[in-house]
């Protein structure tokens, strides 16, 4: 095959510049399913960092300040960096609330409550299924009907009396209390069929619930919150309250999520969901979904267990080891979440020469180009850059691998080839 130089009149017929959309996703160590792609951006990825060495098998990990706690498959509570047996046990993965001073946490399964700090673990008579610290008090419930509030600035005080510990019996048409959160300086009460706000300023006799919204049956395990937003799943889809907008998050995932045994977590503008996902081809994959406010969403095909968000961290376990989610790096199994693949491109329907590529980006990345006749790998440092490729073929594909990058434009210049007569 010979490539001929053409006159100006013939030039447009034999040479073309094409914009290359990055439409598909893949991973370094396994399959990565993209739910929604952001135009001009490679999508926000996450990595993970191992916290425990696996010498003690755990099903859930909790870290607040210098305090570390692990829930073992046997139900035992293990504490400290060595995950030593605390002598306490739970009937299931406990709920966790960080202490106001940031140096520890309270863990409870609704029957047993244990305080874990850097100094060790102690049992308290403050059982809860869900709890939150707000307005100088500890708010907790075990049965979803009676809501206890602690004494001001003394959460350990158990004596019931005016100005001390008290409770509110709160039967409601929206059902039992499933979760408590403190979002945008307000106590949010997520019930079986809706969301309320607890007005708890001033005199204790004036504490009251105010309705915010009603919704379909709520999955309590999916609920998670940041300082500014609350996320949860219902039988009819995904809900958000606060600064985030529901239409900012990928809507693809909700009809494809099994609501059995899901666990949610949140950090920054990201919502994490441990669940089983039905992929577009009909296969079912167990993994961790990650969704952000810009519409990005993807499935990490690794079995994550015990997903929790505590303070400003997201933790999970895999293979009995504890991990924390990080902003950078690879996930389990070497999965890199910033790897994106274009659809096959056939510029002329016959053999062609890829002469050059032009990119405009922020941040470095590796561009790999393949054709049916060969491949090229090019490194870009960022900014506006044009590089020669000189790769022949009929069908071309483009693959971008980046740790952290925004790709604003990717285009390629092709020249059609002619057979020598």
Regions found by a protein language model. Give the residues of each.
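Short beta-strand segments and strand-loop junctions that repeat across beta-rich extracellular domains
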Residues: 78-80, 112-116, 145-161, 198-200, ...
């Amino acid at each position: 095959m010979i490539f001929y130089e053409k006159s100006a009149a013939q030039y447009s017929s034999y040479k073309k510049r094409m914009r290359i959309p990055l439409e598909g996703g893949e991973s370094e160590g396994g399959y990565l399913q993209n739910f929604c792609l952001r135009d001009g951006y490679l999508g926000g990825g996450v990595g993970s960092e191992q916290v425990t060495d696996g010498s003690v098998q755990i099903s859930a990990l909790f870290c607040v300040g210098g305090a570390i706690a692990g829930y073992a498959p046997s139900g035992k509570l293990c504490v400290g960096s060595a995950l030593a047996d605390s002598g306490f046990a739970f009937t299931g993965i406990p709920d966790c609330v960080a202490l106001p001073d940031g140096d520890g946490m309270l863990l409870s399964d609704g029957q047993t409550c244990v305080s874990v700090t850097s100094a060790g673990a102690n049992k308290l008579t403050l059982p809860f299924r869900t709890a939150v610290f707000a307005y100088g008090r500890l708010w907790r419930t075990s049965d979803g009907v009676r809501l206890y509030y602690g004494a001001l600035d003394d959460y350990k005080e158990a004596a019931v009396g005016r100005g001390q510990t008290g409770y509110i019996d709160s039967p409601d048409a929206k059902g039992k209390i499933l979760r408590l959160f403190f979002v945008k300086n307000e106590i949010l009460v997520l019930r079986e069929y809706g969301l309320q706000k607890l007005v708890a300023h001033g005199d204790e006799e004036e504490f009251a619930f105010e309705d915010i919204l009603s919704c379909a049956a709520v999955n309590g395990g999916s609920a998670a919150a940041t300082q500014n937003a609350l996320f949860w799943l219902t039988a009819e889809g995904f809900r958000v309250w606060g600064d985030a907008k529901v239409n900012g998050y990928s809507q693809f995932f909700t009809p494809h999520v099994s609501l059995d045994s899901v666990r949610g977590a949140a950090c920054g503008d990201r919502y994490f969901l441990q669940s089983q996902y039905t992929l577009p081809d009909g296969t079912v994959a167990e993994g961790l979904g990650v969704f952000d406010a810009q519409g990005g969403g993807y499935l990490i095909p690794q079995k994550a267990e015990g997903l929790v968000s505590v303070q400003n961290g997201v933790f999970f376990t895999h293979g009995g080891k504890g991990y924390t989610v990080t902003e950078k790096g690879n996930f389990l199994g070497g999965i890199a979440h910033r790897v994106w693949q274009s659809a096959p491109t056939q510029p002329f329907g016959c053999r062609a020469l890829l002469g050059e590529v032009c990119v405009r980006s922020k941040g470095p990345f590796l561009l790999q180009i393949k054709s049916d006749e060969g491949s090229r790998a090019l490194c870009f440092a960022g900014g506006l850059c044009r590089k020669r490729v000189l790769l022949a073929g009929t069908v071309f594909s483009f693959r971008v691998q980046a740790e952290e990058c925004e790709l604003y434009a990717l285009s390629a210049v092709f020249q059609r080839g002619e057979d020598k007569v």
